[in-house]
């Protein structure tokens, strides 16, 4: 860390087999095909290593200047073969820790057997330090299996 980066926001992702930061603003971070960190991300000094072992899941985090930024995160809830992608624009505050945590929202199903058989929605909480400040959920569409992450009221 440098004196300038002490005020950076730290961004983490967790909750799944693996998660990767795909892009921060225009800077590509981790390649989706080979799962390698881009030279640009290293040159811009936004990538940090959380643990000693790069082979551990979720070993990377970002250290970024405060302000409004676009972030794209790939979560792998079941396996590393299938990613769920979240696009977020957020105003990050200086020297704060932000964690994007994916989970499956357990719900009491009501209605038809078809609706009841659908998997529970995938959700991502954005936590600032320990407090959840935003939530995005991706309901399962019974007809085509596809859905988009939509911000929920907290």
Cite the ranges covered by each PLM segment.
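Short loop/turn and low-complexity linker motifs enriched in small/turn-promoting residues
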Residues: 1-66, 74-154
């Amino acid at each position: 860390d440098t004196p300038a980066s002490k005020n950076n926001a730290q961004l983490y992702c967790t909750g799944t087999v693996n998660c990767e930061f795909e892009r921060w603003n225009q800077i590509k971070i981790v390649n989706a095909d080979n799962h390698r960190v881009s030279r640009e991300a290293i040159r811009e000094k936004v990538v940090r290593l959380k643990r000693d072992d790069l082979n551990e899941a979720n070993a990377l985090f970002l250290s970024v200047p405060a302000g409004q930024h676009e972030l794209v995160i790939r979560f792998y809830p079941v396996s590393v073969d299938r990613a769920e992608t979240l696009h977020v624009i957020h105003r990050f505050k200086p020297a704060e820790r932000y964690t994007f945590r994916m989970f499956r929202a357990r719900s009491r199903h009501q209605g038809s057997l078809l609706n009841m058989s659908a998997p529970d929605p995938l959700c991502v909480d954005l936590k600032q330090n320990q407090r959840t400040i935003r939530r995005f959920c991706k309901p399962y569409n019974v007809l085509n299996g596809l859905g988009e992450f939509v911000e929920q009221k907290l």
